[in-house]
């Protein structure tokens, strides 16, 4: 497994904006500070910021640093393919947009009961494993949003999955809708490394209400 330095990632679902466009100069400063601090893991998806996240990463990261300097995760999202034949061209377009020849991690995005059936019908997992054999993906994983029993089914049916991204924070730990703890326990059962998303719940866990700030 590629070495993720200091176990901390730069998520690109949200980036600084000027109006409707990514603030490129501020994002460059953030990327530089992140790498200078010894971190190296970046996470994006094609739909983030209406397709602007991947483009910003090419401008701010991949065109400015050698490939070995960073670890890049991208994702396959259900609404970008209808058939198996759609997947490979979409993947190749992601490589081009991001300005790289391979992804360190490629995740089947937002897996849950409904999405998973679509991915299975279109042989998305099989296509990803083929791309890994071709050297265009180093590690295949999933990002997951559903009940623990669904996660167990996926990991049973596709033991080749190498890593699982789950929502994990103290609010969602025992939330019956999110089931962070139970999902984490399933990952442990199957000996799968975990990548945490939403550790501060989109900033909500660090944005104090006014009455708390006054204390």
Residue ranges and their predicted role:
Residues 5-9, 40-41, 69-75, 102-107, ...:
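Structural preference for beta-strand elements that scaffold enzyme active sites
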């Amino acid at each position: 497994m590629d070495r993720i330095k200091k176990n901390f990632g730069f998520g690109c679902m949200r980036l600084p904006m000027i109006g409707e466009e990514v603030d490129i100069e501020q994002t460059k400063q953030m990327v530089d500070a992140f790498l200078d601090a010894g971190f190296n893991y970046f996470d994006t998806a094609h739909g983030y910021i209406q397709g602007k996240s991947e483009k910003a990463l090419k401008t701010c990261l991949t065109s400015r640093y050698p490939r070995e300097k960073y670890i890049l995760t991208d994702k396959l999202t259900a609404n970008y393919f209808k058939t198996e034949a759609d997947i490979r061209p979409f993947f190749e377009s992601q490589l081009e947009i991001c300005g790289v020849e391979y992804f360190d991690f490629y995740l089947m995005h937002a897996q849950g009961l409904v999405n998973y059936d679509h991915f299975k019908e279109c042989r998305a997992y099989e296509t990803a494993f083929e791309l890994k054999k071709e050297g265009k993906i180093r590690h295949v994983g999933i990002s997951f949003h559903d009940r623990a029993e669904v996660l167990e089914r996926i990991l049973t049916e596709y033991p080749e999955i190498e890593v699982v991204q789950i929502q994990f924070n103290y609010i969602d730990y025992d939330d019956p809708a999110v089931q962070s703890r139970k999902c984490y326990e399933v990952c442990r059962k199957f000996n799968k490394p975990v990548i945490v998303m939403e550790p501060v719940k989109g900033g909500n866990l660090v944005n104090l209400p006014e009455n708390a700030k006054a204390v």
